[in-house]
Amino acid sequence: MVPKVTSGANVYGVLQYNRIKVEAGEGRILYMQGIPERSDGRFSIEECAEAFGYYTALNPRVRKPVVHFSLNPSPEDRLSEAQLTRLAAEFMERMGYGRQPYVVFLHEDIARRHMHIVSVR
């Protein structure tokens, strides 16, 4: 599996992209680390951005603090949601983002299931 990595300056844009997939029934949140869950279970871009903001403020010189990973397991791999979550957590740990806040989205908008992970540098 080869991850696609993009970085950017606007956390709202990448979170909105993923929220649209969730609201359209083409995706869902698999896991959130370091981001408080709401009592109503809904995803809040504002609260997520606030959790990320603490980390981006630590190094204001970073021009593109948002990192977005797309992980595409082989279509032949029939991984459970628990396995996908573990795969995402292991990936983030190995990339050095294991202690950062991040959100793992599962997308099912194309022929294969894939994950999008949003975090900050």
Feature annotation, model-predicted:
Residues 1-121:
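N-terminal nicking endonuclease/strand-transfer module with a His-rich metal-binding environment
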